A protein has these predicted regions:
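Short hydrophobic/aromatic-rich beta-strand segments that constitute the beta-sheet cores
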Residues: 24, 42-44, 82
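Transition segment at domain starts
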Residues: 5-16
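An anionic, turn-rich surface loop/hairpin at beta-sheet edges
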Residues: 48-72
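Short, surface-exposed charged micro-motifs
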Residues: 13, 31-33, 72
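A short beta-strand micro-motif
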Residues: 2-6, 25
Length: 87
């Protein structure tokens, strides 16, 4: 299960196995796009300046143990986090 948070609030929850794009548009102009494709999730777009979240690459159940942030993709400037969890 993919869970997208804005700040501490759950924004959306989606299956890892249903392809889709989750668009987060905040009142302050921040925008992120989380893409779910073929059992993987990644930050496809962000308005943040540093683009660290986009550069974190894709997350799958098979690669979370080897990722620096484990089962998270984090966009600190926009306060958007993506968690790959069970369910």
């Amino acid at each position: 299960m993919v869970r997208v948070y804005v700040g501490e609030e759950l924004y959306e929850e989606a299956s890892l196995y249903m392809d889709r794009t989750i668009v987060i548009e905040q009142d302050n102009g921040c925008r992120n796009e989380v893409r779910i494709e073929k059992g993987r999730v990644y930050m496809a777009f962000s308005t943040c300046e540093n683009q660290n979240c986009v550069n974190q690459g894709e997350m799958t159940p098979d690669n979370i143990a080897s990722r620096a942030l484990s089962n998270w993709i984090i966009c600190l400037p926009n306060r958007v986090t993506v968690e790959l969890g069970e369910g």
